[in-house]
Structures are given as C-alpha cells and as structure tokens.
Swiss-Prot record:
The active site is at D26 (proton acceptor), H54 (proton donor). GTP binds at residues 25-31, 53-55, 62, 307, 313, 339-341, 425-427. Homodimer. IMP binds at D26, E27, G28, K29, N51, A52, G53, H54, T141, R155, N232, T247, R311. Its cofactor is Mg(2+). Mg(2+) binds at D26, G53. This is Adenylosuccinate synthetase. It is an enzyme of class 6 (ligase). Substrate binds at T307, T308, T309, N310, R311, P312, R313. It comes from Plasmodium chabaudi chabaudi. Keywords: Cytoplasm, GTP-binding, Ligase, Magnesium, Metal-binding, Nucleotide-binding, Purine biosynthesis. Pathway: Purine metabolism; AMP biosynthesis via de novo pathway; AMP from IMP: step 1/2.
C-alpha cells in the first residue's frame, strides 16, 4: 500500500508520514519503514545515535542499520540524518562502506547534528560501571549517547557543520577533548590518531553536510513524499518515558519538529508500531514482565536479542494502558502490529487492560501513566485472558486467513486503543505482512 496516496480521516492526502515506536524499542519499526521507503522520495532520522538498531530482512539477507535511515536500501531514496542526532562517524562510515552501491550519493547530514567521539563512549562505560557498583545501572548500550548529549547541553559539543572547516574543527576538537580528559581524569587518549581519522571524514563528507531544515521544507513544498523514521521508542523519551530508564533524546512525535525543523502542521500521518507482546532491554520497571517459561518462550521464538548489544530482551505480555498513553501523546493515526506469529503455539495469551492500585484498588485513569519507578510499584496489572492458537500463520496474506482466535486478539487491541490496525506482521520479511483496508 502506498500510504502517501491514501486519504486519511477525510482529509487531503499528505506527503509527510512519521513512524514511531510505541513501547521500549525493538517493536519492528525497521520492516514497516522499509516497506514504505519504496514509495517515499526522502527518508529521515530525526533523533538518537548508534544506540538504535533496525534489522531489515530482504530475502535471505539481513541488514542491521544503526545510523542510516532504512531508505538507503532503495536507489530512488534520499536519506537524511537530522538535527537532533549524535553521530559517531566511524560507525557511519562503516555502515556506508558495508552497503556500497554509491550510498553516499544519497545521504545528507544536518549541519546541526552533534559529533560523537570515542571519548564519549569511554565516559559512558566509566559512568555505567560506577552506577553498577551503586546498584543504579541504567543498562545503556555504552555507545556514548548520554555523554554526547551532555556536551551538547553544556554547549561545549561540536556540530557536524564545524567539520567543513577543518582548521577551525581542530581548535574546537582540542578544546573539547582536553576539557573532557581533565574532567574525567582520562590520562591516555590518542588525539592525533583521531584527528587524522576526522581529516579523512572531512574530505569525504564536507559536501554532504547541509542545512537540512531548508532542504526538507523545500521538498515538502515540492510535494515530495517524505518518510520520518523514529529511533528508540516513546517510552524511552527523555521527558515522557520511564525516567531515568530512558534514552537521552526526544523520541516522541515532538522530537520530529526540532529534529527536522518542520512545522507540526506539515505532518500528515503518524504510524505507531506495536509489538504483539512487550520487550525491554536493560534496567527499568516492567509490570507485565514474565520471568518464567513464557518469557523464555517469547525470547527464543521471537529472537529477542538486541540489534545493537545482542543482549537478550526481557519479555512480557502486551500492555494496553501504556499503549493508550503513547497513542495519546503522539496523536497516532494508524497502527502496525508486529510479530503476531511469535504468539502461535501458546495455549493462553494475556493482555494487560488496566493498572490497579495495590492499596486502594482504584484503576489508573485511561490516558495517564505512572512514569516514575516508585509510582509504578504502587500498581499491579489487570489481565484479560485469550485462547491461544497452534496454527502457523506465516503464510497468511489476508486478515480473514488468520485463525479466529488470532483475529479476536487483534480486534481486542484495536477496540481498546480505538485506532485502526492497518498492518499485521506474521513473519520476518517485508512479504510477511497483512494489509487491512481502512478509511
């Protein structure tokens, strides 16, 4: 389905579509972004860095992308790295070289994106080790994301635009690295070697670093089809997620506008990606987590290992109060439900439909969510039980081909969140997707 050509909610068809994860990441955003990228002219990342990971299966080949938008797999697609990204250039160049096929010709990088240096990763590892000793580890990817955003907020970071003038870049680099080495008592750091690497990056990338706000807005006015790709997910948002177990950037729809420099009225459609069960990597509260054979089953059958870290993900039942909250703050128009096939073989499946206060018995107001860990401890999940199904659904091409019990599960989710589920993932590749009609 070419979503850009579809009229939504009786409004004129639009040319700007955003994809957001609705949980703690790893929902399967990469597949739907890949599917829609073949219709778009431009695919954009607006936030985050190499801590994000999209795995895309095309035939028998797997592509793991951490910085590049998924549109790089289509030759007709220009790919943009946005203002609010933090970019480790060694990782970026490795991805570009791995893909080949003149990928660089189709990439633009925001002059306002911040550069993530190796020292940021070193600091990240030091901080996580220290927190682990205190029992307060967040479970970061140690990719340097937090420290890089910290230097950005402290106004001592270096933006991509500075790399165009290498002599000026060297001065900024020396000042930043010396500052961080002194602050974190780092004795041994090879500045000369890293500067040599960055001179190579300067030569390769200087013409790819542009004012992407102007580029995107002119493209919107020219009626180009633009796909906006969210990294991480809503519940990891620095402000609206389960703080402090979050990432360091705005991952919700509000981050799009600063991340790309576009007006909110230019966004036509928001697609929320929902995994059929729930997963989380690292520390943090997880009310529906299943630390039992069910959790083990979901981990193994769903291949729930992090794209970036390869850590096994914590698994549990789908959480609808969380999903409704995320829908509320992102104005989600339609849903892509992923990995329904993983639930095949379970005798019983549960969905959390409410949070109940352990002391008062009161139910949480729909649309709200207790984001602090102490608040969440006051609640317990209220479940609705569904009968499972044994059938292999990976060859189902239409909704009506699904087992009745699987259809009932999908429709229950749709009824609760009052948002149409348009795509249903029933297997790993882009071909394993059911598309439903919607108005």
């Amino acid at each position: 389905m070419n979503i850009f050509e579809h009229n939504i909610k009786n409004v004129d068809k639009g040319n700007v579509v955003a994809i957001v994860g609705t949980q703690w990441g790893d929902e399967g955003k990469g597949k739907i972004i890949d599917m829609l990228s073949k219709y778009s002219n431009i695919t954009c990342r607006f936030n985050g860095g190499g801590n994000a990971g999209h795995t895309i299966c095309v035939g028998n080949k797997k592509h793991a992308l951490h910085l590049l938008p998924c549109g790089v797999l289509y030759e007709n697609n220009v790919n943009v790295l946005g203002n609010c990204m933090v970019i480790h250039l060694k990782t970026l160049m490795k991805e570009i070289n791995n893909l080949g096929n003149n990928i660089l010709d189709r990439i633009y990088i925001s002059e306002k994106a911040h550069i993530l240096f190796d020292i940021h990763q070193e600091i990240d590892a030091m901080q996580e080790t220290r927190k682990s000793k205190d029992g307060n580890a967040i479970g970061t990817t140690k990719k340097g994301i937090g420290p890089c955003y910290s230097t950005k907020a402290s106004r001592i970071g270096i933006r991509m635009g500075s790399l165009r003038n290498f002599e000026n870049f060297k001065k900024l680099y020396t000042k930043l690295i010396d500052n961080l080495m002194e602050l974190y008592n780092i004795k041994d750091y090879n500045k000369e070697e890293e500067l040599n690497e960055f001179y190579t990056y300067h030569q390769i990338l200087k013409d790819k670093i542009i004012n992407i706000m102007l580029y995107i807005n002119k493209s919107i006015d020219a009626k180009k089809y633009i796909l906006i790709e969210g990294a991480n997910a809503a519940m990891l948002d620095i402000d609206l997620g389960t703080y402090p177990f979050v990432t360091s950037s705005s991952t919700t729809i509000g981050g799009v506008f600063s991340g790309l420099g576009i007006h909110h009225k230019k966004l036509n459609l928001v697609v929320g990606v929902v995994k059929s069960y729930l997963t989380r990597v690292g520390s943090g509260p997880f009310l529906t987590e299943q630390c039992n054979e069910i959790g083990d089953y979901l981990t193994k059958k769903g291949f729930e290992y992090g794209t970036t870290t390869n850590r096994p993900r914590r698994c549990g039942w789908l959480d609808l109060p969380m999903l409704y909250y995320v829908k509320y703050i992102n104005c989600i128009d339609i849903i892509n439900l992923t990995k329904l096939d993983v639930l095949s073989g379970l005798k019983e499946i549960y969905i959390c439909i409410d949070y109940k206060n352990k002391t008062t018995g009161e139910l949480l107001e729909k649309g709200s969510y207790p984001l602090e860990e102490e608040q969440l401890r006051e609640y317990e999940p209220v479940y609705e039980k569904f009968e499972g199904w044994d059938e292999d659904i990976t060859n189902c091409l239409e909704f009506d081909q699904l087992p009745e019990k699987a259809k009932k599960y999908v429709l229950a989710i749709e009824s609760y969140i009052k948002t149409p589920i348009v795509w249903i993932g029933v297997g790993p590749t882009r071909d394993h997707t059911i598309t439903r009609k919607f108005d």
